[in-house]
Amino acid sequence: MLFRSEFYFIEINARLQVEHPISEMVSGLDFVKLQIDIANGEPLPFKQKDLKMNGYAIECRINAEDTFLDFAPSTGPVPDVTIPAGPNVRCDTYLYPGCTVSPFYDSLMAKLCTWGPTFEESRTRMLTALNDMYVQGVETSIPLYKTILNSEEYKNGQLSTDFLKRYEMIDKLSEDLKKEKEDKSEAALAA
């Protein structure tokens, strides 16, 4: 704080950026507001023992990456985009129709978060949000997240740092995309 009432931020803790949307969803707290209040000299309005977690939140970091090229960045113009919205859906993003995904920054385009009173409700809400999200012009991590969220391994909580390799998620994604293409072809022929 400078001159009593002017705030200047040089850097905000990156851990807040990564974790705060889902932490806010399960705690009901606004961490950014609390951080600013603390910087303003105000005490926290609660004690640790008062905190209660509620429900389940899932965050998918929507990246401009090509899964089949070892997650290489995908850059360029984004002529059209649809951002999912609705109850218990949050999407923090810079995307808008006509924007450009630059090669000079991190590939993160959006943090898509969902909440539900149960894991299954949060998971199915995330699948709906991923199906509703559309980013034209660049490759994204959206199809991979759909494959992961639909996998029995994910549903059963069999998570690990080698999840993609251990459960052959890239191969499963390839199969899913092939089936999706076949289904679209069959639908077009039937029409």
Segments predicted by a language model, with ranges:
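Catalytic cores of soluble metabolic enzymes centered on carboxylation/carboxyl-transfer
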Residues: 17, 21-191
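Short, small-residue-biased leader/transition segments that mark boundaries at the very start
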Residues: 1-2
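A short beta-strand motif that forms the metal-chelation/ATP-contact edge
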Residues: 6-15
